[in-house]
From Swiss-Prot:
The gene is pepA. Presumably involved in the processing and regular turnover of intracellular proteins. Catalyzes the removal of unsubstituted N-terminal amino acids from various peptides. Mn(2+) 2 binds at K262, D267, D286, E347. This is Probable cytosol aminopeptidase. Keywords: Aminopeptidase, Cytoplasm, Hydrolase, Manganese, Metal-binding, Protease. It is found in: Cytoplasm. Its main location: cytoplasm. Belongs to the peptidase M17 family. InterPro entries: Leucine_aapep/pepB, Macro_dom-like, Peptidase_M17_C, Peptidase_M17_leu_NH2_pept, Peptidase_M17_N.
């Protein structure tokens, strides 16, 4: 698939499918559009009239044109109200166009959409992202090659009237490569993606993009006192892997950042075993935070900003065996704090505790962790929105802006300190869970105990890392949520 920009406008373009975007209640044909309609013998105006097209968001229609026309089919799409026009409108519209072109088996596709904020570069990048992400298909585990219909995707896609935007397209493709890596890591089952697989992925990224990588095994983690992380790993037959991947710019870094991703490649719940109806069969995706972390590393390694970034994953499984940690066990984290385990199914925060301590010791300017941490966050915000907790208002605002620019939905949640009272233990410094109410808040407060002074933010991404059905440029399945927000944050820091 070849995506290019061109100075050619819709009036002069020729190919299989021409897609045009219209704002709501702005569908009158004048100027170049009237000229195009005349060239098409009135088909465009006829399509608008027959479908009662008003330009409302999500509405579209397609018409076939006579064989004598240089354009085989034309598609009109509603963009919604002009005042609500965002970059994500372009992504979602481009996704609809790309899927329609694939369905119509059009090999050449022309797209004419309005500029966002009079910015052809951002407009191009958003359209290219929508196309790349919508057309990504994961067929690794299909035995029937007929299930793979990628050969129907358009071969040539031209973004009309945008001039030369080669750099913006390359940037979009690099960003999408990280999202796709994250999607495919999350989508793969736990017998394919293991802690060792994540470590191998990190090594591959290091080799391909010139990053530094260190993978600590159990003995090295024991030497660093990572009792919380290793407590979770006790029952698994697979070795724990503590992954530290580092991007260093060629010159003096402007800032130093750390991104920490939860890396539970399977979560059985431990001795507090997840039962039928608990979603245990979906727990391959409990490493989505680490997938986003590695996906962001892939992008940063290609874009090469002047910021040093550390990517950290404490990877393991949470399993059951005679070696498993028990409810009631006391673990000692690497900062010396003790934790009474009152629920072995609240294990992600235990692995993150040692990862946060490790990251802060690197002397970074800010820490951000991502984790599929709580079902409570899904109850609060639904499937599409991640929660954000932060000890630092400036950092929180940076991440919110990065998410808004990427189109990944994120909502800041309260850090209600008094709720931590419910996590205090009579025999240890804290318990790993609190009362039922406010579960996503108490989880964030638990993590806060393992960060001293460094500005820190926690993203609970349990909802949006997976889509049960197609939604915008996300196909059903793993979404790669978080990669684009992280990349935008790094680039804007």
């Amino acid at each position: 698939m070849d995506i290019r920009t061109t100075t050619t406008t819709a009036t002069d373009w020729a190919g299989d499918l021409l897609a045009l975007g219209f704002f709501e209640d702005q569908v009158e044909l004048s100027g170049s559009l009237a000229e195009l309609d005349q060239k098409l013998d009135g088909i465009l105006q006829e399509l608008i009239a027959e479908t009662e097209f008003k330009g409302k968001a999500g509405k579209s229609a397609i018409a076939r044109i006579s064989s004598k026309s240089p354009i085989r089919k034309i598609m009109i799409l509603g963009l919604g109200k002009a005042e609500d026009f965002k970059l994500d409108t372009l992504r979602r519209t481009a996704a609809t166009i790309a899927r329609s072109a694939k369905k119509e088996k059009g090999k050449t596709l022309g797209i004419s959409l309005p500029l966002w904020n009079n910015d052809p570069t951002s407009t191009t990048q958003a359209i290219a992202e929508g196309i790349e992400l919508a057309l990504h298909q994961d067929h690794r585990f299909k035995s029937n090659s007929e299930d793979n219909n990628d050969n129907h995707a358009p071969e040539q896609i031209q973004l009309l009237g945008l001039g030369d935007q080669t750099t913006a397209i390359e940037r979009a493709q690099r960003i999408c490569s990280g999202v796709i890596l994250a999607r495919e890591l999350v989508a793969a089952p736990a017998n394919v993606v293991t802690p060792v697989t994540l470590a191998e992925t990190a090594r591959d990224l290091a080799q391909e993009y010139g990053l530094d990588v260190e993978v600590l095994g159990q003995a090295e983690c024991e030497a660093l006192g990572m009792g919380a992380f290793l407590g979770v790993a006790l029952a698994s037959d697979l070795p724990p892997q503590f992954i530290h991947l580092t991007y260093r710019p060629s010159g003096t870094p402007r800032r130093k950042l750390a991104i920490i991703g939860k890396g539970l490649t399977f979560d059985s719940g431990g001795l507090n075993l997840k039962t039928g109806g608990s979603g245990i069969e979906t727990m391959k995706m409990d490493m989505a935070g680490s997938a986003a972390t590695l996906g962001a590393a892939k992008v940063v390694g290609q874009l090469k900003p002047d910021v040093e970034v550390h990517f950290i994953v404490a990877a393991t499984e949470n399993m059951i065996s005679g070696r498993a940690m028990h409810p009631g066990d006391i673990l000692t984290a690497s900062n010396g704090k003790t934790i009474e385990v009152n629920n072995t199914d609240a294990e992600g925060r235990l692995t993150l505790a040692d990862a946060l301590v490790f990251a802060e010791k690197l002397g970074v300017d800010a820490l951000v962790d991502l984790a599929t941490l709580t079902g409570a966050c899904i109850v609060a915000l639904g499937d599409d929105i991640a929660g954000l907790w932060s000890s630092d208002d400036a950092l929180a605002e940076q991440i919110l802006q990065a998410a808004d620019h990427s189109g990944e939905k994120l909502w800041r949640m309260p850090m209600e300190e008094k709720y931590f009272e419910g996590m205090k233990s009579q025999i240890a410094d804290m318990k790993n869970t609190g009362p039922r109410a406010g579960g996503s808040i108490t989880a964030a407060l638990f993590l806060k105990q393992f960060v001293k002074e460094t500005p820190w933010a926690h993203l609970d991404v349990a909802g949006p890392v997976w889509a049960d059905k197609e939604n915008g440029y996300n196909n059903a399945g793993a979404t790669g949520y978080g990669v684009r927000t992280l990349v935008n944050w790094v680039l804007g820091s």
